[in-house]
Structure formats: C-alpha cells, structure tokens
C-alpha cells in the first residue's frame, strides 16, 4: 500500500484581518451600513388640487324579521310553508343528458322542476 504523507501544516486562522493571509479580502468598510441616507429631493406641486370632495353613498335595506318562534325548513315550500319541495327532471333535460353525455348532466340539472306535494305549486 502506498501511504501518502499527511499535511503537517495547520490550516489558516479564521479571524484574519483585511490584507493578511493568502486570501484576498474585501476592502475595509465594504458591506458596512452607511451613516445616514441622503436627504430627499423637494418636489413642487403645481396646479394639482390637493383636496378632493368625498362622496358617501348611504343605502338602506329593508330587513324582514320573522318572529322568534317560527321554524324555517330548508327546502320547504314558500307558498304553504308545510310541504317539502321535490325535484323532478324535465323531458328536455333528460334528453340532453343522453345526447350530450358528459356535458348533458349540466343541462339536466339546470332544467329541473321543483314541486310541492302539499299545495301543488311548481317552481323552476
């Protein structure tokens, strides 16, 4: 086996000052934070109005309040407030779902009818 001689020298120190050692260091003060930024340039405002009138639009809404003891059923009939609306698909919606297979389902769900079984009211 071939044994290579080990390095007997020590590595260079880590705390070298600028200009010492065999590596080139940056000039003194490089990367230091400046004392103060230069003053800003003054600018002149000529002919531009500084005050703009503000316009506030105030809208009022009519809020319908229900009595505290009323129960609102999701999907309930707004006419009789007793029945629950049932969905049914129209003939045209089913036809388009078959003919335009992947995209026809959008038409099928867009063309459905909702009907109340209690009062018979139809909603589209």
UniProtKB/Swiss-Prot annotation:
Protein localization: Lysosome membrane; Cytoplasm, Perinuclear region
GO cellular component, one term: lysosomal membrane
Keywords assigned by UniProt, alphabetized: Cytoplasm, Lysosome, Membrane, Transmembrane, Transmembrane helix
A Pfam family matched in the record: BRI3
Predominant location category: membrane
TM ranges: 66-85, 91-111
Disulfide bonds: none
Membrane association type: Multi-pass membrane protein
PANTHER family: BRAIN PROTEIN I3 (PTHR13551), MEMBRANE PROTEIN BRI3 (PTHR13551:SF1)
Family: Belongs to the BRI3 family.
SUBUNIT field: Interacts with BRI3BP. Interacts with MGAT1 and IFITM3.
Protein name: Membrane protein BRI3
Species name: Bos taurus
């Amino acid at each position: 086996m071939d044994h290579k001689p080990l390095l007997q020298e020590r590595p260079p120190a880590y705390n070298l000052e600028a200009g010492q050692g065999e590596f080139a260091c940056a000039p003194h003060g490089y990367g230091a934070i400046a004392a103060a930024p230069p003053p800003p340039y003054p600018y002149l405002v000529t002919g531009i109005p500084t005050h703009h009138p503000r316009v506030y639009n105030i809208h009022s809404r009519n809020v319908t309040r229900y009595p505290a003891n009323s129960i609102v059923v999701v999907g309930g009939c707004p006419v009789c407030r007793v029945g629950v609306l049932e969905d049914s698909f129209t003939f045209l919606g089913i036809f388009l779902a078959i003919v335009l297979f992947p995209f026809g389902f959008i038409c099928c769900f867009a063309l459905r009818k909702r009907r109340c079984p209690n009062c018979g009211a139809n909603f589209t």
